[in-house]
Amino acid sequence: MTYTLAILGCGVMGQALLSAIYNAPKAADETAAAFYPSKIITCNHDEPSAQQVTDLVETFDESPNGIKVESTYGHNVSAVEEASVVLLGTKPFLAEEVLNGVKSVIGGKLLISLAAGWTIDQLSQYTSTVCRVMTNTPAKYGYGCAVVSYSADVSKEQKPLVNELISQVGKYVELPEKNMDAATALVGSGPAFVLLMLESLMESGLKLGIPLQESKECAMKVLEGTVKMVEKSGAHPSVLKHQVCTPGGTTIAGLCVMEEKGVKSGIINGVEEAARVASQLGQKKK
């Protein structure tokens, strides 16, 4: 089996998926190889955007799975006509215009949508086989997370294909669609929240006299090592947090100040607000 994948809107997230799929390790056997497209057509709205994709692909080595890439602009209809699988990578406010432009040719195609807030019901107006995906920018480096929901019409043969493609970004998690707005906040916006924590740790070191580069390196390693500790130990973060604290010590003193400043509630409320906004993104599209 060979097929073409069309990416409608190959910006930050589209390029992250393109990079992950194109550079995926060579498939172990013919069954796995069939999940990868022989060709990817990227579709953008203007020549500079298309050239950006071309420049990106030129930095890659040859695809381990023999995937070829064609970067285009203004040719959405012909790209979708050729494709069996369509990945919608446009910003949510552009999705309606883009989908209406290919409405006559997208029926019967498998649609993988990255458009936050667009529900399966809304997307099913264009094709019945729909997969909603929320991933994040670390996907570009293979360290992302992707939450996936399927329409009822997606077949048992199509799900493994989506699983294989999306797993290249990092962690693949299948959840009911009712969780997608929360996933948009936690997974999609999550890197920005973590980067705020990283920035805060860096700047605290700088304020206390540690040079910026060394402060950055230490803060990055603290985050990386802590995540690994949670992963390897299997313990709840609160248990590990209290293991660091000693009576009258530095850690509990710092934690008490952070609690007074509302750090934990601020993070929780921030994620909740991001989820609320995500729930509104598709409300105007009936």
UniProtKB/Swiss-Prot annotation:
Pathway: Amino-acid biosynthesis; L-proline biosynthesis; L-proline from L-glutamate 5-semialdehyde: step 1/1. Gene3D superfamilies: NAD(P)-binding Rossmann-like Domain (3.40.50.720), ProC C-terminal domain-like (1.10.3730.10). Catalyzes the reduction of 1-pyrroline-5-carboxylate (PCA) to L-proline, the final step in proline biosynthesis. Homotetramer. The modification Phosphoserine is found at residue 279. InterPro entries: 6-PGluconate_DH-like_C_sf, NAD(P)-bd_dom_sf, P5C_Rdtase_cat_N, P5CR-like_CS, P5CR_dimer, Pyrroline-COOH_reductase. This is Pyrroline-5-carboxylate reductase. Its EC number is 1.5.1.2. GO terms for molecular function: identical protein binding; pyrroline-5-carboxylate reductase activity. Present with 43500 molecules/cell in log phase SD medium. One of its GO terms (biological process) is proline biosynthetic process. The keyword Transmembrane does not apply. It comes from Saccharomyces cerevisiae (strain ATCC 204508 / S288c).
